[in-house]
Design a protein with these regions (language model features):
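Conserved N-terminal beta1-alpha1 strand-loop-helix module at the mouth
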Residues: 1-85, 104, 156, 164-165, ...
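Short acidic active-site motifs
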Residues: 5, 54, 76-77, 97-98, ...
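Glycine-rich phosphate-binding active-site loops on the catalytic face of alpha/beta enzymes
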Residues: 88-101, 131-140, 173-197
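Glycine/Thr-rich beta-alpha phosphate-binding loop at enzyme active sites
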Residues: 39-44, 82-87, 103-105, 115-144, ...
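Conserved beta-strand positions in the central sheet of alpha/beta enzyme cores
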Residues: 18, 43, 68, 90, ...
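Helix-adjacent hinge/juxtasegments
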Residues: 68-69, 74-116, 120
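Short secondary-structure boundary segments
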Residues: 46, 71, 92-94, 113-115, ...
């Protein structure tokens, strides 16, 4: 899939579930549960045991799922993830060399940033979308709206503090998509609960887009 198509898919679905798990098997079960709810995008964090293997398995067995590598802190890790099937790369922080590595492979990169200076620096370095993290620590949707006022040209995906209760507020504030963690994909939850959560979030995004 071309880079532009990946970004278009991320924006269309409007959600990036942040997958954390205690084992590769649990991660694969959660990934299937998310997809069953209609959300065919997910971010496999490097904190998952055997994360690279999980990405490889998903790439081989679930071509319907858009696979992202999360919590990527350096270019070497980014390269490993890309070679094993990651179609976009996400980080909680800004590493210019990681951005450059993703450019080398023509892969969308979503580095983390929080302050206006960090966000602009990430954008100028070539970030396709900036992950505003942790959004909740700075006031949530109100903070995102404040950022978007002077920086409408920078696409942002808030992560941290996104919930069913706040999702619409973040979309109203101008979010490119929503990064959602345990509120959607709690590793302790039953798969059917995760599927129901995915459906719930997808309904919120679709309802918002229909009214916009």
């Amino acid at each position: 899939m071309q880079k532009s198509a990946i970004l278009a898919a991320l924006k269309k679905i409007g959600l990036v579930p942040v997958l954390r798990a205690d084992s590769p098997e649990q991660a694969l079960t959660l990934a299937s549960a998310i997809a069953a709810g209609g959300v065919t995008v997910l971010e496999v964090t490097m904190t998952v045991p055997g994360a690279i293997r999980v990405m490889r398995t998903l790439a081989e067995q679930r071509p319907d799922i858009l696979i992202g590598a999360g919590t990527v802190l350096d270019p070497e890790t980014a390269r490993m993830c890309i070679l094993e099937g990651a179609q976009f790369v996400v980080s909680p922080a800004l590493n210019i060399r990681t951005i450059e590595m993703c450019h080398r492979y023509t892969i969308p990169v979503l580095p983390g940033a929080l302050t206006p200076t960090e966000i602009v620096t990430a954008w100028q370095a070539g970030a396709d979308v900036v992950k505003v993290f942790p959004a909740s620590a700075m006031g949530g949707a109100k903070y995102l709206k404040t950022l978007k006022a002077p920086l409408p040209q920078i696409e942002m995906i808030p992560t941290g503090g996104v919930s069913v209760a706040t999702a619409r507020d973040f979309l109203d504030a101008g979010a490119f998509a929503l990064g959602v963690g345990a509120d959607l994909v709690d590793p302790r939850a039953a798969p059917e609960t995760v599927t129901a959560n995915a459906k719930k979030y997808l309904e919120i995004v679709r309802a918002y887009r229909a009214e916009a």
